[in-house]
């Protein structure tokens, strides 16, 4: 997969989107620093130097976006397990978490944008970057966990090898979509939790997460069972 490496940019997702609109597919935009990194619903994603920030563009007619959405975080977890000896997990919808002193802290996040023609998967991982004081309670870097600087290029390379290996197995029917879902659920730290889900219209839904499938989470609420496709998830207990 072609990699376009930039030292500094506002947003890898935005840059990738412009190229995707011109018809470019199956490439990565990698930046050493983002000045306007975006999280879910346009929230700020701090992207200081030292972190791994990249956006991957795939043809949405060639791949099932619902499967890719689950596969990407699985691949990140499987790669990062080689660098840290702590428990790693996925918080719905796509936060990469690590357990530190009985609490989970955020190691990275994923933002997916989808059209009929292409999908952009933006990935940010705290590797060697200094975590800002205002988010130190909830976020951590690999450097802080391991006590040493890690090779970001190696991490990206290992991610791509893992991701492309899974794609090949799916293509050859060595594994199916439901095996990907099963693996995602194995890493999930949201299933079984009491949560608050903030929706894009600012509505908050509270309930217990009974399951996760390709269409989101299955939530038990006061109204009964609801399926929530996406949202910002806060674990209550």
UniProtKB/Swiss-Prot annotation:
The biological process GO terms on file are: protein modification process
InterPro entries, from UniProt?
Answer: aa-tRNA-synth_II/BPL/LPL, Biotin_CoA_COase_ligase, BPL_C, BPL_LPL_catalytic
GO terms (molecular function) for this protein are: ATP binding; biotin--[biotin carboxyl-carrier protein] ligase activity
Q: For the BPL/LPL catalytic domain, which residue ranges apply?
A: 1-191
Q: Which reaction does it catalyse?
A: biotin + L-lysyl-[protein] + ATP = N(6)-biotinyl-L-lysyl-[protein] + AMP + diphosphate + H(+)
SUPFAM superfamilies, from UniProt? Class II aaRS and biotin synthetases (SSF55681)
Query: What EC class does the entry list?
Result: ligase
Task: Return the GO cellular component terms, semicolon-separated.
Answer: cytoplasm
Domain of life the protein comes from: Archaea
EC number of the protein = 6.3.4.15
Keyword Nucleotide-binding recorded: yes
Pfam families named in the record? BPL_C (PF02237), BPL_LplA_LipB (PF03099)
Official protein name in the record: Putative biotin ligase
Please give the organism: Methanocaldococcus jannaschii (strain ATCC 43067 / DSM 2661 / JAL-1 / JCM 10045 / NBRC 100440) (Methanococcus jannaschii)
